[in-house]
Amino acid sequence: MKIKEVIVVEGKDDTKRIQMAVNADTLETRGSAISDETLDQIEDLYDKRGVIVFTDPDFSGEKIRKIITEAIPGVKHAFLTKHDAAPSHKGSLGVEHASPEAIREALAHLYTEVPDGEPLISREDLAVAGLTSGPQAKEYRRRLGEYLRIGYTNGKQLYKRLKLFQITPDEFKKALEYIKNEDNY
């Protein structure tokens, strides 16, 4: 599988794992303290080839994703579930632990930001669905993030991410039906 865009990852181990799964060029941020020089490189690559942000499903990965998104609106995003990024032994979550199949699957389900898009799902929709409060809210958000392949978020961030990626009411409804069926988990 050849990827035209440059994939932005956190470190060299992520690059190695990505290149085991697909034929792609990567750019490493070398952690969550992204320099202006690195952001300039990402912006240059975005203009020339396109960019896919593919970070770990943890706090640092989300921080990197947010920094890049704010600096360069319109980048594409690939997400791994925490399960797919879990180490087989001790350690933290990371792209470097994902199987080649999980990486290819994430890259097959990219999201492109629509920074100024109108929200298609309301905050009320999230509340009615039990995604912002209640005993199951956190678990439902986790499942929703996995099903839609948009990563885990808290209630406030979920609204922003659904808007950013223009998740449709139909996609949202199908996801809710799936995540609330206990037989699927």
UniProtKB/Swiss-Prot annotation:
Major enzyme class: hydrolase
Catalytic activity of the protein: Endonucleolytic cleavage of RNA, removing 21 and 42 nucleotides, respectively, from the 5'- and 3'-termini of a 5S-rRNA precursor
Domain of life: Bacteria
Record SMART domains: TOPRIM
Classification via Gene3D superfamilies: 3.40.1360.10
Cofactor(s) listed: Mg(2+)
Subcellular compartments: Cytoplasm
InterPro entries documented for this protein: RNase_M5 (IPR004466), RNase_M5_C (IPR025156), TOPRIM_dom (IPR006171), TOPRIM_RNase_M5-like (IPR034141)
Pfam family name, one: Toprim
Enzyme Commission number, as recorded: 3.1.26.8
GO cellular component: cytoplasm
Record note on cofactor: Binds two Mg(2+) per subunit.
Binding locations of Mg(2+) 2: 56, 58
Gene Ontology terms: biological process: rRNA processing
Molecular-function GO terms, alphabetical: metal ion binding; ribonuclease M5 activity; rRNA binding
Domain Toprim residue range list: 4-87
Main location class: cytoplasm
Chain residues that bind Mg(2+) 1: 10, 56
Keyword terms, alphabetized: Cytoplasm, Endonuclease, Hydrolase, Magnesium, Metal-binding, Nuclease, Ribosome biogenesis, RNA-binding, rRNA processing, rRNA-binding
Purpose: Required for correct processing of both the 5' and 3' ends of 5S rRNA precursor. Cleaves both sides of a double-stranded region yielding mature 5S rRNA in one step.
Family the UniProt entry places it in: Belongs to the ribonuclease M5 family.
Protein known as: Ribonuclease M5 1
Organism: Ligilactobacillus salivarius (strain UCC118) (Lactobacillus salivarius)
Name of the gene this protein is made from: rnmV1
